[in-house]
């Protein structure tokens, strides 16, 4: 794979048949990232667990009448002459195939949330992200995203995750370390994406801001290691736990030190009191405190909105809106925090979800499992803008169960480009991470 601009098509990706439109324009990308020192760079991944409704997150205005009257008469996001100017993503694109409006909830935050990030040139909207042969099971699709596979390559290295493979190949020369290469927050279940083929990082579930809990949680993992581990899949899982346990006390010390040395900028004014906000606040504090962890994964759940997506017909308030508000407020505060000093120069964040929702509402004021969904990439190093055209709503019909299936960007292109162009991975590492495993 040759190094390209952000999400430029690689030789390996071409072999997968991925030919998305406008690929050459996408985040040319990470401003000034190429050939620069990558030592302090970090990725912050935000998982929108449950399958986010992309159509009600960023609204396609080029076919709004069909969206409102035919597909979603009861749960559409109202956009009209009175609020269009405040919700439009980019007024210079009005009337084009990239004419989008933000869900009003994405304006939540001291700096107007995602709208403020876009206006400041720090938000890239990736349209129609997915993978070939989309699986609509939560568990299966989450595992496919975690292992770097798609619906056609289910068994291709499914015992390890792309994050784990990336870390053990990119940082082999410095392993082991006294800090985890990746930290997970907001979920009791360790994400499969952290599982490597040989070495293992440490995923943590950290809630709130109690520094004393860090050492207790980690050191509490210690115990007598089992012997006579079988050479089976079950044995591999035991080995993973044993290796993680071996590093737990060392990791506990480094995390405790970083947390105590770190701080948040004016957190009382910027951070809402929400679970996602507390996770991101902890990430910022650990980074400012000197932790050298490369990848952070935080989670917000509840996006499986089969019913009561809004409170009543034609009312935007409801389950989905509250989730988007939490996302916008937390990211707004996090970006304000990290940009209060120089650490924001080396941090890129992005959102992802295991799949999207159907284009047509169901009979319960909700939406059922779909396929493609947008991703948001944000931070100072990001070149703002929109990648890809609006979804073609006419693609969804009764013959395909109201699905929008055209993938403009494969999720592996997004992640592999960040690994290469931002974290500095070479061709060999990228191929071992996503294609040769």
Language model features by range: what are they?
Residues 11, 21-109, 113, 118-124, ...:
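Intrinsic-disorder/low-complexity recognition with aromatic hotspots
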Residues 228-332, 337:
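Anion-binding catalytic surfaces of enzymes that hydrolyze or transfer phosphate/sulfate esters
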Residues 94-214:
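Extracytoplasmic mature domains of secreted/periplasmic and thylakoid-lumen proteins
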């Amino acid at each position: 794979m040759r190094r390209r601009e952000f999400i430029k098509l690689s030789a390996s990706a071409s072999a997968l048949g991925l030919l998305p439109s406008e690929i050459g324009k996408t985040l040319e990308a990470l401003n000034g990232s190429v050939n620069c020192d990558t030592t302090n760079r970090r990725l912050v991944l935000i998982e929108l667990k449950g399958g986010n409704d992309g159509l009600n997150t960023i609204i396609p205005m080029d076919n709004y009448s069909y969206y409102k009257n035919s597909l979603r008469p009861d749960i559409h996001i109202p956009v009209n002459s009175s609020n269009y100017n405040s919700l439009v993503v980019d007024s210079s694109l009005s009337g084009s195939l990239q004419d989008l409006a933000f869900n009003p909830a994405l304006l939540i935050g001291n700096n107007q949330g995602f709208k403020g990030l876009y206006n400041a040139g720090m938000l890239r909207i990736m349209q129609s992200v997915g993978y070939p042969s989309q699986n609509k099971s939560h568990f299966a699709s989450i595992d496919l995203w975690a292992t770097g596979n798609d619906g056609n390559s289910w068994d291709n290295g499914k015992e390890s995750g792309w994050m784990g493979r990336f870390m053990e190949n990119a940082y082999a020369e410095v392993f082991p370390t006294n800090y985890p290469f990746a930290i997970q927050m907001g979920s009791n279940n360790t994400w499969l994406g952290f599982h490597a083929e040989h070495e293992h990082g440490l995923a943590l579930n950290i809630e709130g801001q109690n520094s004393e809990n860090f050492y207790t949680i980690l050191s509490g993992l210690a115990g007598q290691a089992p012997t006579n581990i079988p050479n089976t899949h079950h044995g591999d899982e035991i080995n993973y736990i044993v290796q993680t346990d071996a590093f737990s006390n060392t990791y506990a010390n480094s995390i405790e030190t970083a947390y105590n040395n770190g701080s948040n900028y004016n957190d009382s004014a910027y951070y809402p009191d929400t679970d996602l906000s507390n996770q991101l606040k902890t990430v910022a504090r650990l980074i400012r405190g000197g932790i050298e962890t490369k990848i952070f994964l935080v989670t917000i759940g509840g996006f499986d909105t089969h019913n009561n997506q809004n409170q009543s017909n034609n009312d935007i308030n409801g389950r989905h809106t509250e989730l988007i508000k939490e996302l916008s407020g937390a990211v707004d505060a996090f970006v304000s925090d990290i940009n209060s000093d120089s650490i924001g120069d080396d941090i890129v964040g992005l959102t992802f979800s295991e799949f999207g929702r159907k284009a047509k509402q169901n009979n319960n004021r909700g939406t059922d499992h779909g396929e493609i969904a947008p991703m948001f990439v944000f931070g100072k190093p990001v070149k703002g803008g929109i990648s890809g055209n609006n979804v073609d709503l006419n693609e969804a019909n009764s013959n395909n169960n109201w699905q929008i299936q055209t993938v403009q960007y494969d999720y592996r292109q997004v992640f592999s480009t960040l690994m290469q162009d931002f974290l500095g991975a070479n061709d060999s590492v990228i191929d071992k991470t996503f294609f040769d495993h």
